[in-house]
A protein has these predicted regions:
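Short, low-complexity N-terminal intrinsically disordered segments enriched in polar/charged residues
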Residues: 21-62
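Beta-strand elements of well-folded, non-transmembrane domains
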Residues: 120-124, 140
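Short beta-strand edge/turn micro-motifs at domain boundaries
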Residues: 133-158
């Protein structure tokens, strides 16, 4: 009798444990439009090459949780970022940016993150040409069918 009770109890316990398990289902929303690709990344930098942040605004989310990493320490919105970067870009008369072939793009539902190195060539107002390369990491979120930047980080090697 004890053996039968233990067997039934074990079966009941296993049944309850199995029923308590919730099946994980994908909660990703269907995304409208193709995810960003290298050409899309290049369009962003072509916008920056105009030296007018208004030409890149369409690529950026405007919400309060958007992150940009250029001096000062942080910006809390696209408006703050746009105003701050105007001062930096005012010292230049031309720019060209090229997203290199090492661009890597990863899609997960309504989020995309990408990394790339970007070649830059900028001419300041006095005519001095500055050339280099930097690292770019960017996170996009699909908002109403548009892939918008919600987090961006740019850095250059020391030295």
């Amino acid at each position: 009798m004890l053996k039968r009770f233990l067997t039934v109890s074990l079966c009941l316990l296993l049944t309850l444990a199995a029923a308590a398990q919730t099946k994980k289902t994908a909660t990703k929303k269907a995304t409208a439009g193709p995810a960003p690709d290298k050409a899309y990344l290049q369009k962003i930098w072509d916008g920056w090459a105009t030296l007018d942040p208004a030409n890149t605004a369409k690529f950026y989310a405007t919400g309060p949780h958007t992150f940009f990493d250029i001096a000062p320490l942080k910006y809390n919105s696209w408006d703050e970022y746009e105003n701050g970067v105007k001062g930096v870009l005012a010292g230049y008369k031309s720019a060209k940016f090229t997203v290199n072939d090492d661009a890597a793009i990863h899609t997960e539902g309504n989020l995309v993150w990408a990394t790339a190195t970007v070649k830059d060539e900028m001419t300041n107002k006095s005519g001095k040409v500055e050339m280099g390369a930097f690292r770019w990491t960017v996170v996009f979120e699909n908002e109403d069918g548009k892939w918008l930047i919600v987090h961006e980080h740019v850095s250059a090697p020391l030295g």
